[in-house]
């Protein structure tokens, strides 16, 4: 089994690769983890990871700049139904559109817009940076066994925008930052986290391990 991490000029590639390698250690059947800019490698991969850091429009532009990459992603995830993990802006790109400074089309896998978070408590700063527990919205194999809820482990967030999903069933978990913030979305064989699992210590590694074992 091969897991491909897409390098499109945005994302903590080294951290993501190291986290996947650590989570996969001793896992039967996982042959290799590759960082790639080649859509053919993505097309042949058994699982795909799309990290992302920065502005939505910049990340979409970087993805579009890799000739054939969006098509490969669409075929692998939507047509071939292989597992996909989007991280931070990689998760936001799953949405219908992003509204960060300008309106930009997303991949359209999760109905909804990426909008600026607006905490009810004006003392809470944006960007939201720090550790939060997650409140589960529905069950999912990638969340199995993870310590969620107010007494669960914390995940690490750095963001100013989140995916406001149109369908409640696409939201797997939320965080509280002066109001609900979408933390995890999932639909069919695609899942996305607004937080950084590669920076979320044992909790993040457990989620990544579940993703690598997931057989939708």
Swiss-Prot record:
Residues 2-216 form the Glutamine amidotransferase type-1 domain. It comes from the Bacteria. Pathway: Amino-acid biosynthesis; L-histidine biosynthesis; L-histidine from 5-phospho-alpha-D-ribose 1-diphosphate: step 5/9. InterPro entries: Class_I_gatase-like, GATASE, Imidazole-glycPsynth_HisH. The keyword Chaperone does not apply. CDD domains: GATase1_IGP_Synthase. Its EC number is 4.3.2.10, 3.5.1.2. One of its GO terms (cellular component) is cytoplasm. It is found in: Cytoplasm. One of its GO terms (biological process) is L-histidine biosynthetic process. Pfam families: GATase (PF00117). The active site is at residues 88, 196, 198. Keywords: Amino-acid biosynthesis, Cytoplasm, Glutamine amidotransferase, Histidine biosynthesis, Hydrolase, Lyase. GO terms for molecular function: glutaminase activity; imidazoleglycerol-phosphate synthase activity; lyase activity. It catalyses: 5-[(5-phospho-1-deoxy-D-ribulos-1-ylimino)methylamino]-1-(5-phospho-beta-D-ribosyl)imidazole-4-carboxamide + L-glutamine = D-erythro-1-(imidazol-4-yl)glycerol 3-phosphate + 5-amino-1-(5-phospho-beta-D-ribosyl)imidazole-4-carboxamide + L-glutamate + H(+); L-glutamine + H2O = L-glutamate + NH4(+). PANTHER family: IMIDAZOLE GLYCEROL PHOSPHATE SYNTHASE SUBUNIT HISH (PTHR42701:SF1). IGPS catalyzes the conversion of PRFAR and glutamine to IGP, AICAR and glutamate. The HisH subunit provides the glutamine amidotransferase activity that produces the ammonia necessary to HisF for the synthesis of IGP and AICAR. HAMAP family: HisH. Heterodimer of HisH and HisF. This is Imidazole glycerol phosphate synthase subunit HisH 1. It comes from Nitrobacter winogradskyi (strain ATCC 25391 / DSM 10237 / CIP 104748 / NCIMB 11846 / Nb-255). The gene is hisH1.
């Amino acid at each position: 089994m091969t897991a491909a991490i897409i390098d499109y000029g945005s994302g903590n590639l080294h951290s993501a690769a190291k986290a996947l390698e650590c989570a996969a250690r001793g896992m039967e059947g996982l042959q290799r983890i590759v960082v790639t800019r080649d859509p053919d490698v993505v097309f042949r991969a058994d699982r795909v990871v799309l990290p992302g850091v920065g502005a939505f429009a910049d990340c979409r532009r970087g993805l579009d700049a890799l000739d054939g990459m969006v098509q490969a992603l669409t075929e692998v995830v939507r047509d071939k139904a292989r597992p996909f993990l989007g991280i931070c802006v990689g998760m936001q790109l799953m949405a219908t559109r992003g509204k960060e400074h300008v309106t930009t089309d997303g991949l359209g896998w999760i109905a909804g817009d990426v909008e600026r978070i607006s905490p009810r408590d004006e003392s809470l700063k944006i960007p939201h940076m720090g550790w939060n527990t997650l409140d589960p919205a529905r069950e999912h194999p990638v969340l199995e066994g993870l310590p969620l809820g107010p007494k669960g482990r914390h995940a690490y967030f750095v963001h100013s925008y989140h995916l406001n999903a149109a369908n409640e069933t696409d939201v797997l978990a939320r965080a509280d930052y002066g109001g609900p913030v979408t933390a995890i979305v999932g639909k069919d064989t695609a899942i996305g986290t607004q937080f950084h699992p590669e920076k979320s210590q044992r909790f993040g590694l457990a989620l990544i391990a579940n993703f690598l074992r997931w057989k939708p």
